[in-house]
Amino acid sequence: MAITAGTNLNSVAAPQKQTLSSNYVDFTSSSTEGWAQQYLPELMEKEAEVFGPRTISGFLNQVGAEEAMTSDRVIWSEQSRLHISLRGTIDLDGNVSSSGAKGKFTVTTDIDGNDADDGFTLASHGVRNHDICLLSTPGYVSRVMVVAVDGTAIGVRAYDEDVLTNHSETAGAATLLVIGSEYKKGDNYDGSATHEANEPKFKTFTNKPIIMKDYYEVSGSDAGRIGWIEVSSEGGASGYLWYLKAEADTRARFTDYLEMAMLESEPGSNSTNVDGELGLSPEGDAGTEGLFYAIENRGNVTTGVTGVNAATDLAEFDAILAEFDKQGAIEENMMFVNRSTSLAIDDMLASMNSHGAGGTSYGVFDNSEDMALNLGFSGFRRGSYDFYKSDFRYLNDKATRGGVNATAGSEALRGVIIPAGSSSVYDQTVGAAVRRPFLHVRYRASQTDDRRMKTWVTGSVGAATSALDVMQIHMLSERCLVTQGANNFMLMK
């Protein structure tokens, strides 16, 4: 019988059912120290766990929650900004609707750069007559009053004309911020278009679950075979039955897949070929929005804090804080980073620590220098923010994202910053405002079927369900990730 040569490390499942030399112990090989001889060797039955804890699941359990859903799609909405702030251009000689304005501000986007997205439209910018605004261009800030509004054109007059004339029309985009209003005595709203009420805007997002499956099979004969190696698994299975290890590894790998898919997935585009493979219609309905995709498209991305030196890393970290200030300013945040980024942050913090020579800190054994030296930091405060740092095994392990990062270059992921706590959103499925963690998993469930993590056994081994002389273990899950308030997240690349 021909035996296909396998790898030295039997750590990856074979892509197809085949006999590999790495599945067996060769009793005649010199590496087995002469098992063909008549003397009994000293047998170490316990399988060595050379890769430590191999599973990476648990990240979403730390930072999120799980909740059932009954639909093919989950829809949620998020608050828009409270205050009216716009980007645009300024024409110092412009007039609007013959109002006698001494300047015209033309709206191009809202303060976040949206021109027709996230509930904002140029025609509904919200600026009204008699609003007092701050008008800024590079080097100058003026206080102006709105005297006319015609679509995206806003006519203004300055409280100090001398300052207004200093603005440069070619200096780039201008910013207009409403700070209040002023009316004369006895003045009243007249219900015209220039005095209509402002309705709050909201942003609506959606995601859909994906169906994930895996499978393990062992024949009735092999299920009863006793091996000489004592095996154990992350799931707690142990003994001398090899199929117990194989089944437990399949289950542990599938559990990791449930989390890895929620981190890495992306929704299909209208031109994707995956739709045809899955038989989906309309096009673009394949895939689901994972965490990293959501942050890249709706959140923040930084390339800073790379360990160049402590001073540079600190300046780059402060830039992250400045970006958080522009967003929700969530006080407590959790950092999940790879090893190099974790060490860079430790070095950055150690450089600012005045305790101990060279900025070292004796953080264990009652801070005794003679007992232990702690050069790592798990939590720190900078500005008004608290950060809790943790190593992210998924980004370090060579068999997961760590191996991908080694060849990904500038697209390598070094970590993610996630806000702690919960957010208030309107759930259109529930029909009410609810508070949920910023991250939570939605899984399909009903009174008939719970598809959070569904397993069942078929065959004639054990509980007989068919005439097949096998034990077939099936695993299935249908789930998606809801990333609320992605503007408060930061991806480190």
Question: Language-model segments: what does each one mean?
Answer:
Residues M371-N374, S410:
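Short, flexible coil/turn micro-motifs enriched in small/turn-prone residues
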Residues R381-A399, V404:
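Catalytic core segments in nucleotide and nucleic-acid processing enzymes
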Residues M1-M371, D391-A399, I418-K493:
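Flexible, glycine/threonine- and acidic-rich loop/arm segments that mediate assembly and lattice contacts
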Residues S410-E411, G415-V416:
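Short, surface-exposed amphipathic charged segments that create phosphate/polyanion-binding patches used
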